[in-house]
C-alpha cells in the first residue's frame, strides 16, 4: 500500500512544498536579521528537503503526508507573522524612545559640539603636516573601523557610515564622548589609568597597546555600554512625558533614597581638551542618574504587573482544568453507581432464584443441599481472599499502570506483535514531529515508549476478553436458570408423589442440579471479580493520566490511529483457548519476572476461569462413568441427563491434532487446570469426589440386593449408557441412537421386547468398547509426505550449490558493539539454538510442500547467515548487530509456522478421510448386526447373550481382517516398487557396461565394472522391503549447513548414462555431475574437498576418486590459464612448461627461455603498489592453485594437497601426439637439454637417448587420461595430424638458438616444426 500512494505523488509536488518551506524560512531569517540578515538560501532548501524526506518516509498514506505538510507550512507562516508583528512593535517603541524633541537639550548640544571638534581635528593635522603615517593608514593587526577611530565590534566602516540613519549616527557620536562607567571599565584588561572614553580606547588600539583578546573583551563591554545608553534614553523620554508634579515627586523620592544610601565614589576623570568639553556641570549628571533610576523603577513596576497578570491567567486555567476534572470524575462516579445498581439488581434476582431452588432442593434432598452450602462457603472464602489482595496494595502501586507485558504472547501472535512494534515506532515518530515528545530520544527511551504503547494494547485486549467472558458467563447463567426452572417444574408434579420409594435413587439424578448451581456461583464470582478489575484499571488509568502527560498522549494518539494490520482487529471469540494459552511459557514472562501487583486481580480471574472449566470437565467425566444404579422407570432417569448433555464441552480438533503431531508438549488439559486451581476449589473437588464415591458404593450394594430379590430382567436406565469416544460415529448415526434411546412406556410390560432392547443396549456398549480399542491407536495417523524423487534431490542440490557459490562477506563489528549488545546476541542465539539447528530438517519438507525454488533459496541463504553468526559468536567475534539476529530468528519462525500449518492441514485431510472410512464400516457392521439381532430375537429369544457375544467377536474379526488386508496390500505395493526399481538398476548397469565398451575405454581401470555390479547388488539386497530406493539419496541433502560433497564432481560421463532414467545411485551421481558442469565453478573450494559423508557409504571410494579427478582437472586448467596469461609473448615457454607437466617434471627444475616482465612478477606475487580489487581477490581465493614467481621461475602448488601433485601421463600418450612427425613412436629418444646441443649439421641423422625420462608413475591409470586429452590448449591441433607446408619446408634456415638471443616472433612461427626442435 505504501508504494501505491507514493507513486501517486509526483516530484513536482514535493519540490513545490520544499520551496514553500524554504521561502518561509528565508522570510523569517530576514525579519529577524533586518538589513544585516545573513543566510544561505541553499542551506535553507536542504533543511526543508530533509524535513520533507523524513515526512515522506514516515507517512503511511498520502492524506497523512499532505495533512502534516500543510500543518507545518501553516505553523511556520503563523510564526513568520508573529515575528513580523514583534518587529513592528519594537520599531514603534524605539521611535518613541529616540524621537527628537522640538528643542535641543544641553546634552545634545554638547554632543554636537564634540562631534564638530572631532571632525576638525584630522583636518588640522593634515594641514600642519604633522600627521603620522600610523594615523594615515590602518594598522595590520587592528581592524579598519578601529583604525579610523570607530569603537570596536558594533560601529561600521566609513564607507557604510553614509548609509546610516541620523539616529544611528547620533548614537555613535554619543558613545564616543560618553564616559565609560567604572564597573564596565574594570572588565577591560590592560587599560592604563586616565582612560575613560571609547575614543581613548581606540587610540590605544591604534598604538597596538591592546591584544586581540583585549579587543574582543572591549567589544563586549562596548555592546553592554550601548545597551545601557539606550535604556537611559528610553527612561529620559518617559520622564519628559511626565507632568511637573510627577517630576517633583520623583525628585523628592530620589533625594530621600540618596540621603539614606551612601553614594558610590565617582571615578576620577581626566579631562582632555580634544575629546571632552571643557565644562560638564555635575547637576546634569545627577539629573541623568535620577532619570535612569526612575526609568528602572517604572520598568520593574511594569514587569511586576505583567507577572501578576500571567499568574492570574495560569490560576484561571488551573481552576478550569480542575473543574473539568471534577466534572469527569462525577460523571465516572455516576456511571459506576449505575453499574453497581444494575449489578446489585442482577445479584438480587439471582439470589432469589437460588433461594427458591434451594428451598425446593432442601425439601427433597438435604444431602445435596449441604454439599451446595459447603461449596458456596468455600467460593465465598476464595472471593474474600481475592478482594483482600487489591486492598493490600500500597497507594503508590495503585497509581501505577498494571504491567501486562507478560501476557503479550497469550493475546497476540508473533505477526501481530511485529505489527504492534512497527506501529509503536511510527507513533513515537509522529509524536516527535508533532512536538509532543522530545525531538532526540535515545534508544532506551524509544523502547520504553514503545513498551508503554504495547502495554496499553495488551491491557485493552485483555479487557475485551474479560467482557467476552462476562457475556458468555451471563448467557450460560441464563441458560442454566431456564433449565433449572424447567427441571423444577417437571420434577415437582403431582404424579411424582407416587414414586416415593425411588427417592434415594433420584439422588444420582440431582448431580446435574448441583453442577448447575456450582457453575452459577462460579459465574457470579467471575462477574464480581471482573467488575473489580475494571474499576481498579479505570482508577489507575485516571491517576496515570494526571501524572504522566506523555503517557496520555500515547494513549490518545493510539485511540485516534488506524492500524493497517488486519489481524489486530480480530476479537478472540473463544475464551477457552485464551485459558489454554495462558499455561504456555512466554519469553516476555522471563524478561519481566517481577509482576506488578496491579494485575493480581486479573490473574486471579483468569485462574478461576480455568478452575471452573476443569471442575466442569471433572464432573462430566465422573458422570459419564457412573456405577449401575438399581432399575427404575425411564422417565425419571431421562430428565437429569438433559443438563449433562447440554453441558458437555465440544472438543477442539485443532488442539488434539497438534498434540497428536507432537508439535507441542503433550500435557492433559485436566492436569493443567488442576495445577492452576486455587486451594478452595481443590478442596471442593475432593469433597465432591469422596461423596460421589460413597454414593456409588451404596448404589452398588442396593443393586446387588435388588437383583437378588428381583430375578426377572428389567430395562436399564438411559443414564447408564456411557458416551462414546468417537464423536463422528455419534454424529453419523443420531437417528439410530435416538430411536434406540426413546422410551416405550406402552410396551414395558412385555418381557420379550425388554429383552431385545436390553440386548441391543449391551451390543452397542460392546461395539463402542471395541471401536475404542481399534480407533484409539489409529486416531494419530503418521504424516506421510511424498518421498522426494531423484529430480527433487537434484533440484535441491543445485539450489544448495548456487547458494554456496555466493559466500557471505561480513565485516567484524565486535569493537562497535557494547557489552550489553554482545550479551543480548549470545542470549538470543542460545535461546533459539534448537530452532536454528533444526532448519535442515524442514528444508526438503518446504520444497515438497511449495515446489517453489525461491523459498528454498531464501531459507538456505538465511541458514548460511545463521551458521556464520553462530560460528563467529562461539569464538567471541560478532559480525552483525542484534536487530539482524532478530530478523533471522523471525524469518525462521515464520517458515516453521508455515510448515506446521501445512502439515496440520494435511493431517486434517488424512484424519477426515480415515474417519469417513471408519464410519462407513461401522454403519455397515451395525446394519448387519441389527439384521442378525432381529433374526436371533425371533428365532431364539431364550439365549440372546450368547448370540450377541458371537456377533461382536465376528465383527471384531472382520474389522481386524480388513485392517490386515489393507496393510498387506500396502506392503505388496512397496515390494513391487522395490523389485521394479531393482530391475531398472540392473538394466541401467547393462546399458552402462555396453556404452563403456563402445566408448574406447582404456584397459586399466581403478574399479572394474564387475566390482560396481557387485556393490550395486549388495546395496540392493540390503535395502528394506518397505523402503523406496530413492531414500538412499536423501542422505545427500545437507544436514549440517555445509555444501554437499558430491556436487562438484566434474568427471566426463558418456552420453548414454545421461539419457538413462533409473534411480541407480552411481548413475544418479554421474547424471548430477554431467548436468552441473556448465553451472558450477571449475575450481572446487577447500571446504568441498575436506568434507566427506560420515555415514557408511559403499560408494565412498568412488566418490573420493571422482572428487580427486575433478580437483586434478581443475588444477590443470588453472595452471594452463596462468601460463597463458604470463607467457603471452613467449609461446615457446608455454609449450615447454605444458610438456614438462605431461612428463612429470617439477616447476622449479627447469628454466624459462624468456624473462618474465617485472610488472607481471609484482602482479603475481602481490608485491606491487597497486592492490588487488575485490573481484581479483575473490578470483584468487576461488582458484585451486597458488601461483608465485621466484628467480624467473613460475612456481604453482595445489591448495588441496600438501605434497606436490604430479600431472604426468604415460609416455605412449605423449609420443602418440608426435606419431606423424618423421615416424617417431617413442618419446624417450627426445632430449631437451640445451647444454649438450651439437651443430645442426651433425644432428640431422642422430637420435639422442634419454634414459632418465621415465618420471611419470608406473601405477597411473590410463583410463584417467581422457580429461587431459580433452583439454583444449590454444594451439593449432590440426597440425599434429597433418604434415604439410611447415613440415615440408626443409630449406628453412635454423635459428641462432633460443638461449642466445633469438627473436620471439621467429620462434613463435616455427614452434610446431620438428626441424626447429632438432636444431636446438
Curated annotation (Swiss-Prot):
Q: Does the keyword Transcription apply?
A: yes
User: Where's it found, cell-wise?
Assistant: Nucleus
Q: Which Gene3D superfamilies match?
A: Coactivator CBP, KIX domain
For bias kind Low complexity, which ranges apply? 245-283, 375-398, 540-554, 588-624, 634-688, 702-780
The source's superkingdom equals: Eukaryota
Q: Report whether Transcription regulation shows up as a keyword of the record.
A: yes
Quaternary data: Component of the Mediator complex.
The protein's name in its UniProt record: Mediator of RNA polymerase II transcription subunit 15
Q: Which gene encodes it?
A: GAL11
Amino acid at each position: 500500500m505504501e508504494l501505491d500512494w507514493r507513486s501517486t505523488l509526483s516530484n513536482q509536488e514535493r519540490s513545490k512544498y520544499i520551496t514553500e518551506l524554504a521561502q518561509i524560512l528565508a522570510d523569517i531569517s530576514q525579519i529577524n536579521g533586518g538589513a544585516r540578515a545573513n543566510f544561505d538560501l541553499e542551506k535553507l532548501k536542504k533543511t526543508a528537503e530533509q524535513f520533507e524526506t523524513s515526512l515522506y518516509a514516515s507517512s503511511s498514506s498520502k492524506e497523512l503526508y499532505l495533512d502534516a505538510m500543510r500543518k507545518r507550512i501553516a505553523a511556520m507562516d503563523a510564526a513568520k507573522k508573529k515575528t513580523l508583528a514583534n518587529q513592528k512593535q519594537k520599531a514603534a517603541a524605539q521611535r518613541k524612545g529616540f524621537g527628537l524633541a522640538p528643542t535641543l537639550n544641553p546634552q545634545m548640544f554638547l554632543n554636537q559640539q564634540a562631534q564638530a571638534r572631532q571632525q576638525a581635528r584630522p583636518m588640522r593635522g593634515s594641514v600642519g603636516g604633522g600627521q603620522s603615517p600610523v594615523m594615515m593608514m590602518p594598522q595590520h593587526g587592528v581592524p579598519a573601523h578601529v583604525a579610523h577611530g570607530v569603537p570596536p565590534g558594533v560601529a561600521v566602516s566609513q564607507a557604510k557610515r553614509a548609509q546610516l540613519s541620523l539616529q544611528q549616527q547620533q548614537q555613535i557620536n554619543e558613545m564616543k564622548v560618553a564616559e565609560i562607567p567604572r564597573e564596565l571599565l574594570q572588565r577591560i584588561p590592560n587599560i592604563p589609568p586616565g582612560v575613560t572614553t571609547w575614543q581613548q580606547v581606540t587610540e590605544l588600539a591604534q598604538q597596538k597597546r591592546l591584544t586581540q583578546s583585549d579587543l574582543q573583551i572591549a567589544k563586549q563591554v562596548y555592546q553592554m555600554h550601548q545597551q545601557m545608553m539606550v535604556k537611559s534614553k528610553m527612561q529620559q523620554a518617559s520622564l519628559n512625558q511626565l507632568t511637573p508634579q510627577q517630576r517633583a515627586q520623583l525628585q523628592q523620592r530620589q533625594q530621600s533614597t540618596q540621603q539614606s544610601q551612601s553614594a558610590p565614589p565617582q571615578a576620577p576623570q581626566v579631562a582632555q581638551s580634544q575629546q571632552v568639553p571643557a565644562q560638564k556641570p555635575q547637576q546634569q549628571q545627577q539629573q541623568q542618574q535620577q532619570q535612569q533610576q526612575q526609568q528602572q523603577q517604572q520598568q520593574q513596576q511594569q514587569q511586576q504587573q505583567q507577572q501578576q497578570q500571567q499568574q492570574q491567567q495560569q490560576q484561571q486555567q488551573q481552576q478550569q482544568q480542575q473543574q473539568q476534572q471534577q466534572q469527569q470524575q462525577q460523571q465516572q462516579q455516576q456511571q459506576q453507581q449505575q453499574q453497581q445498581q444494575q449489578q446489585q439488581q442482577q445479584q438480587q434476582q439471582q439470589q432469589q432464584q437460588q433461594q427458591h431452588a434451594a428451598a425446593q432442593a432442601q425439601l427433597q434432598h438435604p444431602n445435596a443441599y449441604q454439599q451446595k452450602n459447603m461449596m458456596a462457603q468455600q467460593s465465598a472464602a476464595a472471593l474474600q481472599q481475592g478482594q483482600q489482595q487489591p486492598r493490600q496494595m500500597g497507594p503508590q502501586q495503585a497509581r501505577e499502570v498494571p504491567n501486562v507485558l507478560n501476557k503479550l504472547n497469550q493475546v497476540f501472535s508473533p505477526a501481530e506483535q511485529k505489527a504492534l512494534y512497527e506501529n509503536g515506532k511510527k507513533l513515537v515518530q509522529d509524536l516527535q514531529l508533532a512536538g509532543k515528545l522530545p525531538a532526540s530520544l535515545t534508544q532506551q527511551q524509544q523502547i520504553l515508549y514503545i513498551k508503554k504503547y504495547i502495554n496499553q494494547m495488551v491491557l485493552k485486549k485483555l479487557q475485551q476478553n474479560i467482557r467476552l467472558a462476562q457475556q458468555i458467563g451471563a448467557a450460560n447463567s441464563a441458560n442454566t436458570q431456564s433449565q433449572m426452572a424447567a427441571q423444577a417444574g417437571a420434577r415437582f408434579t403431582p404424579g411424582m408423589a407416587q414414586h416415593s420409594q425411588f427417592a434415594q435413587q433420584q439422588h444420582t439424578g440431582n448431580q446435574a442440579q448441583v453442577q448447575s448451581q456450582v457453575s452459577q456461583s462460579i459465574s457470579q464470582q467471575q462477574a464480581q471479580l471482573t467488575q473489580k478489575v475494571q474499576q481498579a484499571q479505570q482508577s489507575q488509568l485516571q491517576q496515570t493520566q494526571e501524572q504522566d502527560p506523555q503517557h496520555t498522549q500515547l494513549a490518545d494518539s493510539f485511540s485516534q490511529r488506524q492500524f493497517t494490520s488486519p489481524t489486530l482487529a480480530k476479537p478472540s471469540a473463544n475464551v477457552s483457548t485464551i485459558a489454554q494459552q495462558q499455561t504456555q511459557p512466554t519469553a516476555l514472562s522471563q524478561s519481566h519476572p517481577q509482576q506488578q501487583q496491579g494485575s493480581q486481580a486479573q490473574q486471579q480471574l483468569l485462574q478461576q476461569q480455568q478452575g471452573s472449566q476443569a471442575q466442569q470437565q471433572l464432573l462430566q467425566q465422573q458422570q459419564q462413568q457412573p456405577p449401575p444404579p438399581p432399575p427404575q422407570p425411564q422417565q425419571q432417569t431421562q430428565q437429569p441427563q438433559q443438563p449433562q448433555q447440554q453441558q458437555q464441552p465440544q472438543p477442539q480438533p485443532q488442539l488434539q491434532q497438534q498434540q497428536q503431531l507432537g508439535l507441542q508438549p503433550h500435557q492433559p488439559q485436566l492436569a493443567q487446570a488442576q495445577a492452576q486451581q486455587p486451594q478452595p476449589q481443590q478442596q471442593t473437588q475432593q469433597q465432591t469426589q469422596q461423596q460421589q464415591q460413597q454414593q456409588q458404593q451404596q448404589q452398588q450394594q442396593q443393586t446387588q440386593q435388588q437383583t437378588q430379590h428381583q430375578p426377572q430382567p428389567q430395562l436399564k436406565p438411559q443414564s447408564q449408557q456411557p458416551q462414546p469416544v468417537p464423536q463422528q460415529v455419534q454424529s453419523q448415526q443420531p437417528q439410530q441412537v435416538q430411536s434406540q434411546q426413546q422410551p416405550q412406556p406402552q410396551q414395558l410390560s412385555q418381557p420379550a421386547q425388554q429383552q431385545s432392547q436390553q440386548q441391543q443396549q449391551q451390543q452397542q456398549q460392546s461395539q463402542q468398547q471395541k471401536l475404542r480399542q481399534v480407533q484409539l491407536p489409529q486416531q494419530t495417523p503418521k504424516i506421510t509426505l511424498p518421498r522426494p524423487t531423484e529430480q527433487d534431490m537434484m533440484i535441491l542440490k543445485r539450489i544448495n550449490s548456487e547458494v554456496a557459490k555466493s559466500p557471505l562477506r561480513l565485516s567484524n563489528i565486535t569493537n562497535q558493539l557494547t557489552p550489553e549488545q554482545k550479551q543480548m546476541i549470545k542470549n538470543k542465539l542460545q535461546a533459539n539454538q534448537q530452532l536454528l539447528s533444526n532448519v535442515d530438517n524442514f528444508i526438503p519438507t518446504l520444497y515438497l510442500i511449495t515446489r517453489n525454488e525461491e523459498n528454498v533459496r531464501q531459507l538456505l541463504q538465511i541458514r548460511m547467515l545463521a551458521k556464520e553468526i553462530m560460528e563467529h559468536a562461539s569464538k567471541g567475534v560478532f559480525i552483525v548487530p542484534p536487530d539482524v539476529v532478530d530478523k533471522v530468528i523471525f524469518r525462521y519462525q515464520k517458515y516453521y509456522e508455515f510448515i506446521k500449518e501445512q502439515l496440520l492441514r494435511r493431517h486434517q485431510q488424512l484424519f477426515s478421510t480415515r474417519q469417513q472410512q471408519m464410519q462407513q464400516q461401522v454403519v455397515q457392521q451395525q446394519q448387519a448386526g441389527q439384521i442378525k439381532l432381529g433374526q436371533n430375537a425371533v428365532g431364539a429369544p431364550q439365549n440372546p447373550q450368547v448370540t450377541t457375544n458371537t456377533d461382536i467377536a465376528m465383527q471384531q474379526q472382520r474389522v481386524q481382517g480388513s485392517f490386515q488386508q489393507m496393510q498387506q496390500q500396502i506392503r505388496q505395493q512397496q515390494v513391487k516398487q522395490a523389485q521394479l526399481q531393482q530391475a531398472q538398476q540392473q538394466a541401467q548397469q547393462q546399458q552402462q557396461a555396453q556404452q563403456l565398451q563402445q566408448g574406447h575405454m582404456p584397459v586399466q581401470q581403478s574399479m572394474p565394472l564387475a566390482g560396481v555390479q557387485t556393490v550395486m547388488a549388495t546395496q540392493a539386497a540390503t535395502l528394506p522391503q518397505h523402503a523406496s530406493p530413492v531414500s538412499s539419496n536423501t542422505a545427500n541433502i545437507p544436514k549440517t549447513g555445509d555444501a554437499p560433497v558430491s556436487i562438484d564432481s566434474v568427471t566426463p560421463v558418456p552420453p548414454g548414462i545421461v539419457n538413462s532414467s533409473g534411480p541407480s545411485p552411481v548413475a544418479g551421481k554421474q547424471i548430477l555431475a554431467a548436468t552441473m558442469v556448465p553451472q558450477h565453478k571449475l575450481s572446487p573450494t577447500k571446504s568441498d574437498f575436506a568434507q566427506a559423508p560420515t555415514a557408511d557409504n559403499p560408494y565412498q571410494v568412488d566418490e573420493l576418486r571422482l572428487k580427486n579427478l575433478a580437483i586434478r582437472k581443475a588444477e590443470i586448467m588453472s595452471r594452463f590459464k596462468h601460463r597463458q596469461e604470463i607467457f603471452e609473448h613467449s609461446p615457446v615457454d608455454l609449450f615447454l612448461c605444458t610438456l614438462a607437466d605431461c612428463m612429470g617434471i617439477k616447476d622449479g627444475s627447469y628454466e624459462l627461455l624468456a624473462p618474465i616482465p617485472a610488472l607481471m612478477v609484482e602482479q603475481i606475487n602481490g608485491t606491487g603498489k597497486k592492490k588487488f580489487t575485490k573481484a581479483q581477490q575473490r578470483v584468487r581465493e576461488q582458484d585451486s592453485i597458488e601461483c608465485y614467481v621466484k628467480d624467473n621461475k613460475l612456481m604453482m602448488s595445489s591448495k588441496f594437497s600438501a605434497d606436490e601433485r604430479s600431472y604426468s601421463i604415460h609416455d605412449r600418450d605423449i609420443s602418440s601426439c608426435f606419431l606423424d612427425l618423421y615416424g617417431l613412436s617413442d618419446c624417450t629418444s627426445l632430449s631437451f637439454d640445451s647444454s649438450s646441443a651439437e651443430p645442426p649439421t651433425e644432428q640431422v641423422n642422430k637420435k639422442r637417448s634419454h634414459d632418465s625420462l621415465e618420471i611419470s608413475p608406473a601405477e597411473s591409470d590410463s583410463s584417467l587420461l581422457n580429461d587431459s586429452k580433452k583439454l583444449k590448449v590454444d594451439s593449432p591441433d590440426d597440425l599434429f595430424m597433418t604434415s604439410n607446408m611447415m613440415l615440408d619446408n626443409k630449406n628453412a634456415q635454423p635459428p641462432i638458438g633460443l638461449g642466445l638471443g633469438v627473436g620471439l616472433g621467429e620462434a613463435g612461427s616455427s614452434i610446431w616444426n620438428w626441424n626447429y626442435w632438432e636444431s636446438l
